[in-house]
Amino acid sequence: MALPLLFSCSGKGSSKGGGLFGATGKPLEMVVVLPEGYDSEALRDSVKQALGMPMMVLPQNEPLLTVMMTGERDFSQMFKSLRNILYITIDKERYTSPSIGISRDQFAGGQLLIHARAESLESIYRLLDLKGRSIADMIYKEELVRLSHAFDQTYSSEVAKLMKEQIGGWTIRVNTDLEYTHTGDHFLWASDQGVKGRTDFFAFTYPYEGPQSLELDRIIAVRDSVLQQNVAGAHEGSYMSTEHRVPQVVRHVEANGIPRTEVRGLWAMVGDMMGGPFVLHAINDEANKRVLVVEMVVYYPGGPKKNLMLLAESQLYTLEAAE
């Protein structure tokens, strides 16, 4: 299942709620609507600075968001159909302080509309400076949810079966392209063997011995040990490991009612020249007194990795306890 170039958030040509057609546009693409009378080069520069951060932990810088801008008067149906919209409003009669709000499906089904409201241009500048990262994170999380639903009905039954056999107690829905599989002791590996951008999935477990079992050092130490044993490279003696020269980024997230420790970092092949980004979720599997780790890695030397990582990461959000 390739990442679509033009994605309809509720199905192409379908409608959702009150006859709305599905929102369109590329993942992580957004339009910013600038208020009438305030559309200036300075405001546009402020928007670019606030929303121009790179995606976290990639080997090269890639902008997290693709940002388009339009004036309020030119906010046509083409823009109204897009999946992510930031609508800036300045009105001293209606607002006394800056605020951020969201609404959904206003112009199209599956659409996220973020409102930035303030009483003055100066307040908008401050709001963008303070909340730019929060706005970007909101859009990124929305894209993960959207893409994860692409696997509600169509997913790899082979990986689901191996997850049950090798891990037990959990199910995950991953891309049907992940058809090359390998198993070990409480370990599962699936790959699409892609030529222009490759994605691999890992799942493994280790004993839960207290809160320290979910700390970064422990997760990475186990990861390195498991991958050294199970993921050999093309050259004799080579194996996958963590690139320790680049710090990992840790966050605590929740999906399907399950708290998760999220770790982002770079991987490298010891004894070879391969490398790329990874993201994993580590979970306290209380019923089985163990930690479950599910992970996606991407390999695309010299190529853009943002969309590959987004699609790969979205599949981790399909993990849930087996019935």
Positions of PLM-derived features:
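C-terminal motif of bacterial Sec signal peptides marking the signal peptidase cleavage site
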Residues: 5-8
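Start-of-domain marker
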Residues: 13-110
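Secretory pathway targeting signatures of secreted, lumenal, and periplasmic proteins
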Residues: 14-17, 32-37, 41, 175-238
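Long, acidic/polar, low-complexity amphipathic helices and coiled-coil-like
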Residues: 102-165
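Surface-exposed amphipathic alpha-helical segments
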Residues: 125-149, 172, 178, 289-323
